[in-house]
Amino acid sequence: MNHLARILFFIALPAYGLLPSLAKSQTAKDLITPRMTQEASAPGKRVRQVAPEYEGTRVYHTLYLPTDWQKGKTYPVLVEYTGNKFPACGSTGEVKGANLGYGLSGGKGFIWISMPYVQKGKKENAVTWWGDRQATIDYCKVNLPRICKEFGGDLDNLFICGFSRGAIACSYIGLADDEIAAFWKGMIAHDHFDGQKKWGYPESDRASALKRLARLKGRPTLVCGNANDYLKDHPKLGTFTFLPVPVGKIFDIPDGPVIHTHTDLWAHRDSPTRQTARAWLQKQIRFK
């Protein structure tokens, strides 16, 4: 194409409605979760950290400081638990594979921590179910205040969140006793919820789950996706907001890393659903 033809081509584009779509494809980019590194913590970095109690083991958590992080300031915190290892949907079950918190925050304004499930024997993280449940609970109890103290996490604005296994963990781990339950300003659970069905681990029945949920004491909970509708029968336990997530409409699956409708990547693409979730989160912080 010679120079004159190239000019005429681009002059003609608006008449055919092509320039707006071209601009959209360039600006409406999906989020990409930062890769975990071994670096020192810094704004915009997601780093691997080992608690002093677990030095010499493969147990770790990840810490992400938002791009607008400044020393001496405080930030709300998203504490995430991952789904089980389930290759069919792309879930690795690993701490470093977490995505939901990054999608909800967009990488700014929130400290984001991905907590481990400590495997039995306390030598590594568990990628399926709970490992040593009490050790998992204790890890959060010890390390969440420690991280907040060092990096400016706002103890009055801690939100637990999770996908699949992690959605169940919001209650099964996060409301396991009064001490850990007292941390949370609210929770965000996507696809599944503690008590929706009975699984193969202890106290997964609904009666046990309802005892845990009593510790929620009416606090705000964003209930996203599927396998959680029994909560509609228990409105007094929490301030529940139900948010359907039409993954199949947000993505043309398979669509890049999204290979299944059961995914923690739904908030990585702009959509009315993501906008609703983020607005819900900001509202909870405003009404501190």
Predicted features by range, described:
Residues E179-T273:
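The feature captures the conserved acid-bearing segment of alpha/beta-hydrolase catalytic domains
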Residues K73-Y75, A88-E94, K123-T128, Y172-I173, ...:
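Short, solvent-exposed loop/turn and secondary-structure capping segments
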Residues L8-G17:
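Bacterial N-terminal signal peptides
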Residues R269-K288:
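Catalytic active-site module of serine/aspartate enzymes centered on a nucleophile-bearing elbow/loop
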